[in-house]
């Protein structure tokens, strides 16, 4: 449910001309969500909505009336806690709009930057898009490339290769 709500807000922001200003301001607020005190203030029903607006305004040197109206809307609808999801969804929509996609390479060992760049170049050609890959360490012996936004997943497992090789040898015998 919260993803649907965040998606609607992000879609509305993505259609604006000042999307980058909104995105930067939301990122500032999003970084504050790691602080428990900030979350307590945002989620508190005891703090008046006007005080919450003043508190959030204090994060910004330059006031943007459109962004302030957006914050008021979130406050009025008690949806400030959706800001992290809105930021995440907005990042996804911006990337889609700019034809940039982020993928994850799962491997047992950390891949070198050179290997990641090589994979990026090959995937860029395959999908005719700008692919950025991050490396995450996993426990299994397989290598897995996941591009969630494009619905692409490729995995190579030594165990699976070994099993297929054994089957092939048994068929020959």
UniProtKB/Swiss-Prot annotation:
Q: Where in the cell is it found?
A: Cell inner membrane
Superkingdom, taxonomy of origin: Bacteria
Give the SUPFAM superfamilies listed for this entry. Answer: N-terminal domain of the delta subunit of the F1F0-ATP synthase
* Cited Pfam families: OSCP (PF00213)
- Membrane protein topology class: Peripheral membrane protein
What keywords would UniProt list here? ATP synthesis, Cell inner membrane, Cell membrane, CF(1), Hydrogen ion transport, Ion transport, Membrane, Transport
Question: What molecular function terms (GO) are annotated for this protein?
Answer: proton-transporting ATP synthase activity, rotational mechanism
> Has UniProt tagged this entry with the keyword Cell membrane?
yes
**Cross-referenced InterPro entries, in alphabetical order?**
ATP_synth_OSCP/delta_N_sf (IPR026015), ATPase_OSCP/dsu (IPR000711)
> Which pairs of Cys residues are joined through disulfide bonds in the record?
none
> Can you supply one Gene Ontology CC term for this chain's record?
plasma membrane
The record's comment on protein family reads: Belongs to the ATPase delta chain family.
Record's subunit section: F-type ATPases have 2 components, F(1) - the catalytic core - and F(0) - the membrane proton channel. F(1) has five subunits: alpha(3), beta(3), gamma(1), delta(1), epsilon(1). F(0) has three main subunits: a(1), b(2) and c(10-14). The alpha and beta chains form an alternating ring which encloses part of the gamma chain. F(1) is attached to F(0) by a central stalk formed by the gamma and epsilon chains, while a peripheral stalk is formed by the delta and b chains.
Function text: F(1)F(0) ATP synthase produces ATP from ADP in the presence of a proton or sodium gradient. F-type ATPases consist of two structural domains, F(1) containing the extramembraneous catalytic core and F(0) containing the membrane proton channel, linked together by a central stalk and a peripheral stalk. During catalysis, ATP synthesis in the catalytic domain of F(1) is coupled via a rotary mechanism of the central stalk subunits to proton translocation. This protein is part of the stalk that links CF(0) to CF(1). It either transmits conformational changes from CF(0) to CF(1) or is implicated in proton conduction.
Q: What is this protein called?
A: ATP synthase subunit delta
**Whose protein is this, by species?**
Campylobacter jejuni subsp. jejuni serotype O:6 (strain 81116 / NCTC 11828)
């Amino acid at each position: 449910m919260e993803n649907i709500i965040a998606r609607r807000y992000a879609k509305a922001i993505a259609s604006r001309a000042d999307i980058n200003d909104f995105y930067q301001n939301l990122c500032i607020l999003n970084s504050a969500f790691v602080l428990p005190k900030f979350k307590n203030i945002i989620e508190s029903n005891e703090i008046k909505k006007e005080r919450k607006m003043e508190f959030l305004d204090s994060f910004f040197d330059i006031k943007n009336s459109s962004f302030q109206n957006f914050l008021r809307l979130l406050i009025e609808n008690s949806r400030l806690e959706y800001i992290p999801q809105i930021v995440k969804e907005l990042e996804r929509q911006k990337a889609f709009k700019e034809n940039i996609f982020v993928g994850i390479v799962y491997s047992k060992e950390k891949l070198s930057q050179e290997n990641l760049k090589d994979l990026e170049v090959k995937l860029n050609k395959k999908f005719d898009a700008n692919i950025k890959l991050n490396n995450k360490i996993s426990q299994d012996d397989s290598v897995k490339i996941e591009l969630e936004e494009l619905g692409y997943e490729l995995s190579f497992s030594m165990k699976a290769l070994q099993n297929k090789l054994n089957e092939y040898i048994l068929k020959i015998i």
